[in-house]
Amino acid sequence: LAGGSACPTSFRDTVHDFGRTTLVEAVKRALSVVGFTSVLDSDELVSTGRRKEDLQIHDCSPVLLVEVKGIAGMPTEHDAIQVGKYLAPRMKEWGRTDVGGVSIINHQRNVPGLDRSLSPFTDVVLTNAIDQQFGLMTTWDLFRLVRNFLQLGWKPDDVQPLFYRHGRMEAVPVHYEYVGLIEKYFEKVGVVGIRVVEAAVQQGDRIAYELPIDYIEQEVESLQAERRAVATAAAGVLAGVKTNLTKEQARTGVRVFRIKTRATR
């Protein structure tokens, strides 16, 4: 997995210099970093029949089958949905139906991470993933999750539930609640105008700005709407929030999230 100029150049290096030699090993180590404690390499297990998935996650129900693929271009339908073909055989072999899957694709592996397509999966693949009940993730997503997990002190239960979702899995932790987008930036006063689309924002909340690689978290110390101080900015409002973001960071279209507290989850 190639990163941007500020990042290491391979996936094996990005996840805290793990020193592993294969993509599967790097993914396995990344999963352990976010708190999974029972990640098994299928090649090391005794199993009947032909080779199946690369990894298995046995931390809780359902068991997750993880298929890892590295490809030079964009993933084909076969590449992306292969893990779905392993579900029924494993259910039969293990005599249980609580088996899910995750397909982790290192697409455009020779391209720097920041230059890769953010939409590598076709509509057909996305539909199949939902219908067959497995998740789709890129190694760039996984890298971003691990990097921010380490930098921002996220907890395992902020990230692990993502792997049990079906369809496209974004690099957005579960304790982030979508607010809206940056629409304006007032450089002289250090204020961003956030168009609130979903979750309301209150003074005293913590919010996160999604940059190309990292998230920047901060407290909402002051909040304005229609040029006056308010306690809450609801959907539809252009909320003015004091920020430490630079002009380069506070670009139009940057996604903003409200950080849910433990008590409100």
Walk through the language-model features, giving the residues of each.
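Long, non-membrane, amphipathic alpha-helices that form coiled-coils
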Residues: L1-R12
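Catalytic core segments in nucleotide and nucleic-acid processing enzymes
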Residues: S10-A171
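Beta-strand/loop-dominated core regions that host nucleotide or nucleotide-derived cofactor-binding catalytic loops
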Residues: V174-R265
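Polar low-complexity intrinsically disordered regions
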Residues: L1, L31, N110, E198, ...
